[in-house]
A protein has these predicted regions:
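Membrane-water interface at transmembrane helix exits
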Residues: 22-26, 38, 98-106, 152, ...
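Divalent metal-coordination and catalytic microenvironments
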Residues: 37, 56, 101, 140, ...
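Interfacial segments of alpha-helical transmembrane regions
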Residues: 5-13, 69-97
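Membrane-embedded catalytic cores of phosphoryl/pyrophosphoryl-handling enzymes
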Residues: 118-221
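N-terminal transmembrane-helix/juxtamembrane module of multi-pass inner/ER membrane proteins
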Residues: 1-68, 104-128
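Aromatic-anchored segments of alpha-helical transmembrane domains
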Residues: 17-20, 92-100, 174-184
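Hydrophobic alpha-helical transmembrane segments
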Residues: 57-79, 143-151, 155
Length: 221
C-alpha cells in the first residue's frame, strides 16, 4: 500500500507539473527556448537519415500504439486478468486529454517550411489543419509513454523469462527517449510539446500502474 500511495502522489505531482507547463506554454514563456532548441536541431539535420527517423516515428504513431495496446489487453484477458484489461482506459483517457488540449490551447507547431515530413499516419488528416492543428502536447510522446510503459510494467511482473523482466524497463525507456529525439530531429514539435507529452503520458502511465497493482479483495496484490 505504501508503494501505491507513493505512486498516486507521484501522479498528482506530475499532473500539477503538467498544468504548470501548460500555463507557461499558453503564456508564451517557452517560446525563446523552443526556438533555440529548434535551431540547434536544424543544424544536426542529415537528409540521408530522414527515412530512418520517419520509421522511428511510427513507433509512436496512433496505428502502432493502438495495436500494441490491443495486444496487451488480449494478453491480459488470455491470462485471465479480465479486470486488469481495463487499464486500456488509461490509454483512451490520455488520448482524449491530448485532443482536448490541442483543440483548446493555441500553440502552432514549427513552421511547415522548416519541419520535415513526419512518418505517415492517419492523424495527419486531422492535425494538418483545423482545430487540432495545434501541437501541444505531442501525441507521439503521450502514446509512447503510456503504451511502452504499461507493456514494460506487465512484462516485468508476468514474463516467465528473467531476461525479459530485466530488460522491460530499459527497453521501454530507450524507445521513449528515441521518440523524443525523433520529434525534435524531424522538427515537427517544439521542445515544450515533447515535455508536455512526457508529463501527460507519465500521469496516465502511473494511473494505469496503480490500477494494475490495486489491492485485491481477500488478499494482497
Amino acid at each position: 500500500m505504501t508503494a501505491l500511495r507513493a505512486r498516486i502522489a507521484a501522479a498528482a505531482a506530475l499532473a500539477v507539473a503538467y498544468i504548470a507547463l501548460t500555463m507557461a506554454v499558453a503564456a508564451g514563456l517557452f517560446n525563446p527556448l523552443d526556438k533555440q532548441v529548434l535551431q540547434g536541431f536544424l543544424g544536426l539535420w542529415n537528409e540521408s537519415l530522414h527515412p530512418l527517423f520517419q520509421a522511428i516515428a511510427e513507433l509512436g504513431g496512433l496505428e502502432v500504439t493502438t495495436l500494441l495496446m490491443i495486444g496487451l489487453v488480449v494478453y491480459l484477458l488470455r491470462r485471465r486478468f479480465g479486470a486488469d484489461a481495463w487499464v486500456v482506459l488509461a490509454f483512451v483517457a490520455a488520448q482524449a486529454l491530448e485532443l482536448f488540449y490541442k483543440a483548446t490551447l493555441y500553440h502552432p507547431g514549427p513552421p511547415r517550411s522548416i519541419a520535415h515530413t513526419d512518418g505517415p499516419s492517419i492523424t495527419e488528416l486531422v492535425s494538418s489543419s483545423g482545430p487540432l492543428a495545434n501541437s501541444f502536447p505531442s501525441g507521439h510522446m503521450v502514446r509512447a509513454v503510456v503504451v511502452y510503459g504499461l507493456i514494460a510494467f506487465v512484462v516485468q511482473r508476468l514474463a516467465p523469462w528473467s531476461l525479459a523482466r530485466r530488460l522491460a524497463i530499459p527497453v521501454a525507456t530507450f524507445v521513449i527517449v528515441l521518440l523524443a529525439f525523433d520529434r525534435l530531429y524531424l522538427d515537427v514539435h517544439w521542445e515544450s510539446d515533447v515535455l508536455g507529452g512526457l508529463l501527460l503520458g507519465a500521469v496516465a502511465l502511473l494511473a494505469g500502474s496503480v490500477w494494475l497493482d490495486r489491492p485485491l479483495p481477500g488478499g494482497d496484490n
